[in-house]
């Protein structure tokens, strides 16, 4: 039998060679695949558009109108008048803005560093680390409304735990939530109880992504734990720090549930989110006014979200 120079018998059948057409057919989508893909993309998109984009854009549009919420034919276009009145003749606006700023600064200076410190400690794989993480993270699972109820009981003037402890030392009961000079700080401590666990988890995730070789190299060079953290670990946490900043800004703006549960957001606890609710669902039903304040909150949040997005794109280019 003759044999070709390629080593394949001339009489043998040619081996099956996949063609381009065969490759295309192997990756051809079935009708079921298309339906599943359409549902997986379409349903979340519709939910996002219906529950996020439509309300947000509607709020922006209504901020340029005067409307009492009764009948679409009663909507009146007034341009920037709502914004001018908010910044010039609306007394609660600047105190609420100041309280939100205090909320943000307090979050950045107190619970965020505490969360970072706890993350560094728990990253060392101590005994019962998982238990500690669960206990510290537990308040994050609770809604802000439930946190408000818990701390309202803690701060109670007559039967609260804090005043009961102070009474053992001969201190008279303190009205933590009724005193305008104290209630904001009392509520900030309650909010920090939840925020610490949130920051701890974020920083733990960031610490797990730091290359252990960097820490080992710093230790070989004779760096102390503090020096290794300051000059090696913390700079490597820059992406997480941006995330923490954005989340903290958003948390400080959306702090509505906690103060509304405690005293309805009055008497020293005015916040921008409370003003939005009071104008939209209050007795006056000033939909345009409340929408204008909500739009101001949206703009503030968008600034930090854009900073975060630009940072992500910059990291990807590297």
Spans of features found by a protein language model:
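Short, Lys/Arg-rich, polar N-terminal cytosolic tail immediately upstream
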Residues: 2-31
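Compositionally biased, low-complexity segments enriched in small residues
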Residues: 1-2, 15, 96, 129
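A structural signal for multi-pass alpha-helical bundles of membrane permease subunits
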Residues: 33-318
């Amino acid at each position: 039998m003759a044999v070709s120079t390629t080593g394949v018998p001339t009489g043998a059948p040619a081996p099956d060679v996949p063609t381009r057409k065969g490759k295309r057919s192997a990756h051809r989508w079935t009708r079921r695949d298309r339906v599943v893909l359409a549902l997986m993309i379409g349903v979340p998109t519709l939910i996002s558009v219906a529950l996020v984009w439509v309300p947000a854009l509607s709020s922006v549009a209504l901020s340029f109108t005067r409307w009492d919420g009764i009948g679409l034919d009663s909507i009146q276009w007034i341009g920037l008048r709502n914004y001018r009145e908010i910044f010039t003749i609306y007394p609660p606006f600047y105190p609420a803005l100041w309280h939100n700023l205090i909320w943000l600064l307090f979050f950045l200076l107190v619970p965020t560093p505490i969360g970072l410190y706890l993350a560094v400690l728990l990253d060392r794989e101590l005994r019962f680390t998982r238990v500690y993480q669960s206990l510290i993270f537990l308040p994050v699972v609770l809604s802000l409304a439930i946190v408000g109820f818990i701390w309202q009981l803690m701060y109670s003037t007559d039967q609260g735990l804090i005043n009961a402890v102070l009474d053992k030392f001969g201190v008279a009961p303190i009205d933590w939530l009724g005193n305008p000079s104290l209630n904001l700080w009392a509520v900030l401590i309650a909010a920090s109880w939840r925020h610490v666990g949130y920051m701890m988890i974020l920083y733990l995730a960031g610490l797990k992504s730091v290359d252990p070789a960097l820490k080992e190299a710093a230790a070989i060079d004779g760096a102390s734990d503090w020096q290794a953290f300051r000059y090696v670990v913390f700079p490597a946490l820059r992406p997480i720090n941006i995330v923490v900043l954005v989340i903290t800004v958003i948390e400080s703006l959306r702090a509505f549930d906690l103060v509304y549960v405690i005293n309805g957001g009055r008497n020293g606890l005015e916040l921008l989110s409370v003003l939005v609710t009071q104008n939209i669902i209050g007795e006056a039903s000033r939909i345009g006014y409340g929408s204008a304040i909500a739009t101001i909150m949206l703009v503030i949040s968008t600034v930090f979200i854009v900073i975060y997005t630009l940072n992500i794109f910059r990291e990807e280019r590297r």
